[in-house]
Swiss-Prot record:
It is a single-pass type II membrane protein. Belongs to the CcmE/CycJ family. Residues 1-7 are cytoplasmic. GO terms for molecular function: heme binding; metal ion binding. GO terms for biological process: cytochrome complex assembly. The keyword GTP-binding does not apply. Residues 29-156 are periplasmic. Gene3D superfamilies: Nucleic acid-binding proteins. This is Cytochrome c-type biogenesis protein CcmE. The keyword Glycoprotein does not apply. It is found in: Cell inner membrane.
Length: 156
């Protein structure tokens, strides 16, 4: 083999390896990608059946039903135009309420019922976790105390 043929062989092998790595990476991203659909899109048959995706909307007022086991909850997610029945087995987030925003992750069954394996309650932009609110309150108090002390020392 000449030097040129060896170089060409190494270049081709590197290209094949790079192509395989790219294909594997793209395949991994595609399998982990979860799409978001509204109830109107689901009613229009735009959402895949038996494939994982996210459903977002509002919890319809008067739709929450708890089963006897205490862990299975049925409710309807609506976008005010259409509604999708959801069944979830597990603990709901503290912010889960009727009329509030929710994002559920799961699969749409053949019967049109969305079987959720995760439910996230959405909150408005004014929400602040209690720990963050306490930390902010303490920081404000420290700043006010420092301002008072510097004002006292400046007046002396």
């Amino acid at each position: 083999m000449t030097r040129r043929q060896r170089r060409l062989g190494i270049l081709l092998a590197a290209l094949v390896c790079a192509g395989a790595a790219t294909a594997l990476t793209l395949n991994a991203f595609r399998s982990n990608l979860v799409f978001f659909f509204s109830p109107t899109q689901i009613a229009a048959k735009e959402a895949p059946v038996a494939q994982v995706f996210r459903l977002g909307g509002l919890v319809e007022r008067g739709s929450i039903q708890r089963e006897r086991d205490g862990m299975t909850i049925r409710f309807i997610v609506t976008d005010t135009a259409r509604g999708v029945p959801v069944v979830y087995h597990g603990l709901l987030p503290d912010l889960f309420r009727e009329g509030k925003g929710v994002v559920a992750r799961g699969r749409l069954g053949e019967d049109g019922v969305f079987v959720a394996n995760e439910v996230l309650a959405k909150h408005d932009e004014n929400y602040m976790p209690p720990e963050a609110a306490d930390a902010l309150r303490r920081a404000v108090q420290v700043n006010e105390q420092m301002a008072k002390e510097s004002a006292r020392s400046a007046s002396r």
